[in-house]
């Protein structure tokens, strides 16, 4: 069977460097048998084609023959690849392989009009141009593949010299055709195929995966991230034994073609000058179905053909030429690998991401042992979990042992053999991601993933999956190799140092999207329970302190914690109960500190987000009558609740001394917090009213040094106002002094202005002189301010000092007309007319006289005119009425006012406030225009008022006529 693989003898540089002949023969026989069955199936299909009807449409084989005849002049010898029957050196009748060839692309575009049924090529013209440009430089060392001109008439996808039985990895239609730089063009010489070569030639026979990967638009969009991910830094290459070893890294990509037809192909990339691997580019149709993106986040690896496990595993695989070159012990290498992995970030931006295989020849035997289990599937393999977990940073744990869940302890090689695309589990290594926080899961489900889909969320961390065969067979395991906290920390570094994140290549589904998932989940969680999260709640250590219980979110922190820290396995904040530690971990790891599911808040508690049983009972039990003494220990919690706050307020009005003392003792430590609470501030206000005098004083002392910030706060300003009303004078004065220097700021604030008003109302004038003096020179400005106008009105009401009154009124009276028309200033003028001195009202009315009609038609000034009619004297009122009637019989000013939307109210106010003589005069003038007024919307209002007045006058006259005869 071995000769069928196209193998040739090779000159061995070192007899001890190759794998055993037994392994090679065994693998060769297995692969040869698979190829033989494939050939038999193709032969059977070709025989069946002989019986096709003559009227059937042409087949691809016929097109191949025609293409070969056209290009070779009938013989078709130079284009053996087009011959469907030539299995030895051609494409073997594979339609997709045939359609990928650049020669077929030229043939297709030349003959597509002659034969419309020709299958379209899998390469675009852009791909062909790139390939042709690179074809001219294929004789340069370090070019793309081994593309030396063995036959000038051969296709671009020619084989390496001396190998007629297998195609090389250059048959891919995307990365290799696009000019993937870095594949050395060294000749193969006489080297014999190694185990890795044979293995790579048959890499495609893995389990099918249902989902197709999402592909970037072009290789150029993706190459920067992939190249950076697959370049080994110097420190990552240290310790490789042989001077010129084989080093493999799977480089995967997408096509430049604009159509989505071509499937991604996998080739082997050699990042260092070495021999080109053989047989790594062939992929069967089965393989193409295996290239599925399993990540639910559609990360940057979504366009890759092979798993990230394969990239990491083969990138450091060293097929050394000498078994004894590395004489260091296993423990020394393990220590070095841990040190290089954890601190490799100092040497290069991507060193942390490189997972190396141990540099020992017996690693091949471990890989072979894992290969036997590579076809085993876990019980939950699906689009979310391909049946194998993400490779552990400790690559030496390639044990074939399987545990209760049928997963390998470290399935790195198993994943590689099965050609699965990584792992999309919501692993706990994402410290900032609360993906594990789905409700309905406790710590016993952490190894099972989503409850609904049955996926294994923590499969990649290998938590608790130790077989009962661990002590009896397989590779020996060191306890430190399965420390779950190191796995978590290492993978967090690996994710956060991904160069694709440095380039902002998020792909729509990266680590940043996980943060969005966290926010979305937190919002959904809050809405589900409907209870705001509280801080400072006592912890219940009997509950799970796990993010899966939904009580809080996990945030990044050191995963290597002390037993007294929340991350400790034995900490009360541990994701597991104490009795689960023995169940989940072997004895070798039970004494390790550090949590398993990410860092946890020191003050996190299950009680956060859930109301106490007492409060819930109070709100649910409507029939039972509660007393204040029954909620002892829950006063603060009740105060922060809408119904609990109302209950305390009602009970405080009739509470006994003991009950008041109980409430006082509980609210005092949290007084400042409750003052700014939407419901708690009412409890504080009520306690200021009904608390004992000593308690009120002590509570007022809590306000000192906090008066200004509380005055500017929506709920705190109410507490300050209540305190200014009820506390003793000395405390009032002390509180008010804290506003000195901030008066104007408070006046212009929507909350602070109420505090200033309360100070003017409740504090003696001599103690607030600093407030009043601040207003001098700014009265007009404040009068036109939405909040300042209220403060000026309080000054006019409560400040009786002659000097203060004269200064304020002087500024107001100097701008009466302007203030009367201002949306806020008109209230100040109205306040002066209502509460001012008679001489001040006279000044205002005389200022408005001559502009009454104009002012009456203005929205805000019309209110001022009405106040003039209401509070003015008889002489002042007569002056205004005469101006409204005008000097002619037509009464033009009166007609205009009755038809105006604002002035008609002034006319109605005149009819209400004037004496009988003036009212009779006005009614006589209005009756002349009564019919015309009914045609106007606002005139109807005046007509209705007149009719009411007439009816009232008639009733009054009738009543007088009845009373006069009786008196006679």
From Swiss-Prot:
Span of domain PUM-HD: 610-950
Location in the cell: Cytoplasm
Domain notes per entry: The pumilio repeats mediate the association with RNA by packing together to form a right-handed superhelix that approximates a half donut. The number as well as the specific sequence of the repeats determine the specificity for target mRNAs.
Superkingdom as given in the UniProt entry: Eukaryota
Modified sites of kind Phosphoserine: 194
Protein name: Pumilio homolog 1
UniProt KW Cytoplasm keyword: yes
Ranges annotated as biased composition (Polar residues): 211-220, 227-238, 291-303
Biological process terms in GO annotation: regulation of translation
Phosphothreonine carried by residues: 261
Higher taxonomy: Eukaryota, Viridiplantae, Streptophyta, Embryophyta, Tracheophyta
Mapped Pumilio repeat ranges: 630-665, 666-701, 702-737, 738-773, 774-810, 811-846, 847-882, 883-924
CDD domains: Pumilio (cd07920)
Role this protein plays: Sequence-specific RNA-binding protein that regulates translation and mRNA stability by binding the 3'-UTR of target mRNAs. Binds the APUM-binding elements (APBEs) in the 3'-UTR mRNA sequence of CLV1, PNH, WUS and FAS2.
One GO cellular component term: cytoplasm
Region spans: Disordered: 1-25, 138-171, 204-240, 260-303, 360-382
UniProt-recorded Gene Ontology molecular function terms: mRNA binding
Coiled coil: none
Alphabetized UniProt keyword annotations: Cytoplasm, Phosphoprotein, Repeat, RNA-binding, Translation regulation
